């Protein structure tokens, strides 16, 4: 939030922009590599958060209108899928579907809000048209491959893990969660899918956030932008 707020004022001052973008790019790779090394599911999510925040640093540090929009969408997508994953991770089989949907958004699978955010972020970096932007884009794409890898590992470890010999027996020993607790991750996962299929519904919300950071920013989120470099990446 502070980076997003301060970049319009400090973006042209000294090394601010380069420092923020460089720190963000390094964090995307560091967080992704650390997430792949974890054996605790919550630690996978925690280190994955470092990677996602690094991507946000890159976008808000870049500071162009489209990058700011992409950063706001990524912030919203990350809040939805990561909150859902943290609430659903555990032994209860009822959370399996929620975990798969939320992990798909984390990985940037099409028809999820995570995909909309990731494509917008790529497009913002492509449009920057600079050598630095191309280098950062290459780093972010590499980090996104790590994100896909640890998201897949999360799902496979949750559904098909071999270290837990009797997950159902362990689940039976736990107190059943309250209905409200069951509903919260389900609502967030549903939001991820609905926003991924109809992202234009978020235009007023994302537009208001983007305009507060970069006045005059116009937001028109779509599922299909045609075949372009961002989609191919």
Where are the regions a protein language model picked out?
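Hydrophobic transmembrane alpha-helices and their helix-loop junctions in integral membrane proteins
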Residues: 1-173, 197
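Cytoplasmic/organellar membrane-interface segments at the starts of transmembrane helices
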Residues: 153-233
